[in-house]
UniProtKB/Swiss-Prot annotation:
EC numbers for this chain: 3.4.23.36
Record has Protein transport as a keyword: no
Catalytic activity: Release of signal peptides from bacterial membrane prolipoproteins. Hydrolyzes -Xaa-Yaa-Zaa-|-(S,diacylglyceryl)Cys-, in which Xaa is hydrophobic (preferably Leu), and Yaa (Ala or Ser) and Zaa (Gly or Ala) have small, neutral side chains
Record protein name field: Lipoprotein signal peptidase
HAMAP family linked: LspA (MF_00161)
Subcellular location per the Swiss-Prot or TrEMBL entry: Cell inner membrane
Recorded topology in the membrane: Multi-pass membrane protein
InterPro entries registered for this protein in UniProt: Peptidase_A8
Keywords for the protein's UniProt record, in alphabetical order: Aspartyl protease, Cell inner membrane, Cell membrane, Hydrolase, Membrane, Protease, Transmembrane, Transmembrane helix
Residues annotated as catalytic: 120, 138
Pathway info: Protein modification; lipoprotein biosynthesis (signal peptide cleavage)
Sequence similarity: Belongs to the peptidase A8 family.
Source organism of the structure: Syntrophotalea carbinolica (strain DSM 2380 / NBRC 103641 / GraBd1) (Pelobacter carbinolicus)
Amino acid sequence: MKLAQFRILLLIATLVVAVDQLTKGLIVRCLKLHEALPVVPNFFDLVYVRNKGAAFGILANTEYRVPFFIITTSVAVVFLAWFYRQYRPDQVLGRCAVSLVLGGAIGNLIDRVRFGEVVDFLDVHWYQYHWPAFNVADSAICVGVGMLLLAQWRDGIRHQA
């Protein structure tokens, strides 16, 4: 595969990593740990928290969590690069989806290597009912997975027709 075929991957993943790290850096500089800044009252705050675990704090208190997350994320990054190669150049949705997931994985990997945990700052809630805080990398992963499912479904329908 030629380098030109990796343009989408490099562009989107780099953009996700850059925006993720920039926003996390701003939050760390502008807010104190656990400080919240209401943006939309009773619905959305910017908050500075750190997550030692995976999604929803899973494995946060595991002894070897940092090496575990660094190794599993590194393996995922290699797998995603391989998976990207499986898409034909005309399968743009799938390529964009994998690129988003890869960028998000790298963004959170950078935090794990630097801090041993991930900086989260987006807090969506309904009054006192909070969804766990997340970040740009998490958002890219979720959107990318959704797009990946859509791409797989769409490709499945095309093969049946």
